[in-house]
Amino acid sequence: MLFRSDEVEITVEPKQEDKPDIDQFSLTCTPLEKAETTLRLIKSQGYERVMIFCNTKHMCQRLCDDFQRAGLDCECLHGDIRQQQREKTMQRYRSGKLPVLVATDVASRGIDVDDVDCVINYDVPEENEYYVHRIGRTGRAKRKGVAWSIIGNFPEKAKLDEIAKFSNYTIQPMVLSPDGQLTKEEVKAPPAPKRRFR
């Protein structure tokens, strides 16, 4: 095996001009509060066309079922959805008759809808590139978009911080009150180390 001395490693980062105009936020809650928090966010902000991403088809179906029981008009797309049902769902979503679509990354490939008001990462994606692709569903055709990430545990927060650093994005932590009011989360400075006196 031959080794070349002129080999170099190239790292490709997203270009600033490639980034759409999207305001990015996060909400932190307990894992058991994620569905209720997401539902309250959608209803309180008046989004008309929302795309929600889950990492697994099981969570995708479960979340859609929970939302339907809560009275939200939504459908889901994942690997177990038959083609006929998928086409029917997409026709409703594209026409604006379906306000909320819950999908996995794989099932959402090929979806091309320009006027998505909001993208919600119900699960923080496992790959940095998935985040970029997900939020790229909003903020199209020179429209301003909004992207939310729902944080349910520390690993999700750590992953979102990694994504923000990799993509050079600013993701503003927010607090959603029980009555649907949004405020910026106050980031507390870490406590100063205690000095030991001898």
Label the predicted regions.
Residues 1-187, 195-197:
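Conserved helicase RecA-like core
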